[in-house]
């Protein structure tokens, strides 16, 4: 449960920072891969970021914890994160289209 709260807080921090940028589709795809890809495929997916080995190892360690979540709980978490990402994107697009309302 603590990990899902952490993931939620990270997502909120990324969505509601001052720049008002639209949420990167790669971030949304990475969240899905994190929760549903097997370890080997996810490790290959992380290669696109050219992250240091220590960062990849840390991410994989967290993934091993989330892999123990039931499929039902993973669906609940990704559904909530999807709603947050959608809300962030809609809010950011409104700010871009009408800056005086921000």
UniProtKB/Swiss-Prot annotation:
Q: Which InterPro entries match?
A: Secretoglobin, Secretoglobin_sf
Q: Which family does it belong to?
A: Belongs to the secretoglobin family. Lipophilin subfamily.
Is Nucleotide-binding tagged as a keyword? no
Give start-end of the signal peptide. Answer: 1-21
Record-linked PROSITE patterns: SCGB (PS51311)
Q: Which GO terms describe its cellular component?
A: extracellular space
Pfam families found in the cross-reference section: Uteroglobin (PF01099)
Function summary: May bind androgens and other steroids. May be under transcriptional regulation of steroid hormones.
Top-rank taxon: Eukaryota
Query: Main localization of the protein?
Result: secreted
List the subcellular locations: Secreted
List the keywords (alphabetical): Glycoprotein, Secreted, Signal
State the name under which the record lists this protein. Secretoglobin family 1D member
Carbohydrate-modified residues are: 87
